[in-house]
């Protein structure tokens, strides 16, 4: 079932501006075992605390808003970490430490279209009006249930949102082509490739260092 970690607002409420609203959509489907889940969460936590990522964040006017959704089957998504405004190294470190302690929510089918739909709506619940809105979908497999991923991505892109991908290689069929042609969409969207779960931290760091400077350049 879809679980929200805080009440859903009936209309957007914006408390202030920010440079980037970024949702991490983390795959916890059945193809991801518990050790691989830990590599994802630990890798994301460490990537957020990377010295270069922290230095780039400090240059973003208004800071960033971050959230994390775990996703699996069509009705299996959880907003595990609601929107949090991050404007300093200590803010980002606190968010990263919370991610490292996140308990796994699901282990069912693979419905990337469903999490893209949820994330698109959840951007509206961000209490800060962000200059750019991005959803990062990471995963190791192709869709096997839920709405058509390409359509969900196109609808989110039509709202001005960007959907980036971080694909983890190693499954059969190869998910890279699926992510490249069905997941990524919107302004300046791109795909980052991890050669396996052990490479997730490096790929996440590189993805962040590609996303964040584009916001700095627009400030």
Describe every region a protein language model picked out.
Residues 51-60, 108-109, 127, 131-133, ...:
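Surface-exposed patches in mature extracellular/periplasmic domains of secreted proteins
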Residues 141-182:
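VWA/integrin I-like adhesion module and closely mimicked acidic/polar interface patches used
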């Amino acid at each position: 079932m879809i679980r929200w970690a805080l009440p859903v607002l009936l209309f957007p409420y914006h408390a202030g501006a920010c440079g980037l609203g970024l949702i991490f959509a983390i795959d916890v489907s059945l193809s991801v075992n518990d050790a691989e889940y830990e590599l994802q969460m630990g890798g994301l936590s460490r990537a957020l605390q990377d010295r270069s990522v922290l230095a780039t964040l400090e240059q973003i006017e208004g800071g960033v808003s971050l959230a994390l959704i775990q996703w699996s089957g069509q009705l299996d998504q959880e907003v595990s970490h609601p929107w949090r405004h991050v404007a300093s190294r200590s803010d980002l470190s606190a968010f990263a430490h919370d991610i490292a302690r996140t308990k796994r929510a699901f282990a069912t089918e693979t419905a990337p279209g469903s999490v893209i739909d949820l994330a698109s709506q959840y951007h509206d619940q961000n209490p800060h009006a962000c200059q750019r809105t991005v959803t990062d979908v990471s995963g190791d497999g192709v869709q096997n249930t839920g709405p058509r991923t390409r359509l969900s991505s196109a609808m989110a892109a039509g709202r001005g949102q960007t959907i980036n991908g971080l694909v983890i290689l190693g499954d059969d069929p190869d998910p890279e082509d699926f992510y490249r042609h069905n997941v990524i969409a919107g302004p300046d969207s791109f795909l980052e490739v991890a050669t396996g779960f052990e490479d997730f931290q490096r790929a996440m760091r590189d993805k962040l260092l590609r996303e964040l400077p584009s916001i700095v350049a627009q400030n």
